[in-house]
Curated annotation (Swiss-Prot):
Belongs to the Nudix hydrolase family. RppH subfamily. Keywords: Hydrolase. This is RNA pyrophosphohydrolase. Accelerates the degradation of transcripts by removing pyrophosphate from the 5'-end of triphosphorylated RNA, leading to a more labile monophosphorylated state that can stimulate subsequent ribonuclease cleavage. The keyword Metal-binding does not apply. Residues 6-148 form the Nudix hydrolase domain. Pfam families: NUDIX. It comes from Francisella tularensis subsp. holarctica (strain LVS). Its EC number is 3.6.1.-. InterPro entries: Nudix_hydrolase (IPR020476), NUDIX_hydrolase-like_dom_sf (IPR015797), NUDIX_hydrolase_CS (IPR020084), NUDIX_hydrolase_dom (IPR000086), RppH (IPR022927). It is an enzyme of class 3 (hydrolase). A motif (Nudix box) lies at residues 38-59. GO terms for molecular function: pyrophosphatase activity.
Length: 155
């Protein structure tokens, strides 16, 4: 779903383990790492999109996690000109609703091959603030906003 301004509606997931470390996934066939994320389909709520993406990208089901919080606002980022899609509808970036989840099931339930088109090749747990400086540069500010917003929910 791309809005009139050219931003694609998207959800992003910060998944915590019991030690409050976060899931960090390496994009398939790439060297870049990121949080699970994906588009919101027409007629889908952000919560529904989050659960769908959670299963598609890392194999987890709603019963495997607890939703701790979500951002009130949509956080936007622009993509570099070289990545802007030139055919209609033109997409200049993403607007994201972020979700903070706590893993309730064993980490062995994480399955990067739950989908026919896996998003990630590899994953690991990293410290809470690590992703801000290790995600692709044009996503750093939205990562900073989301992690800062969620910090108050972490015990």
């Amino acid at each position: 779903m791309i809005d009139k301004s050219g931003y694609r509606a998207n959800v992003a997931i910060v998944l915590l383990n019991k030690q409050n470390r976060v899931f960090w996934g390496q994009r398939r066939n790439r060297t870049s790492w990121q949080f699970p994320q994906g588009g919101v389909a027409t007629g889908e709520t952000p919560l529904q999109a989050m659960y769908r993406e959670l299963h598609e990208e890392i194999g987890l089901r709603p019963q495997d996690v607890e939703v701790i919080a979500s951002t009130r606002d949509w956080y936007k980022y622009d993509i570099p000109d070289s990545l802007v899609r030139t055919k209609e509808p033109i997409c200049i970036g993403q607007k994201q609703k972020w979700f903070l989840l706590k893993l309730k099931s064993p980490e062995s339930y994480i399955d990067l091959d739950a989908n026919d088109s896996p998003e990630f090749d590899n994953w690991r747990w990293v410290s809470y603030w690590y992703p801000i400086n290790h995600v692709v540069y044009f996503k750093q500010e939205v990562y900073r906003k989301a992690l800062t917003y969620f910090k108050e929910y972490i015990a």
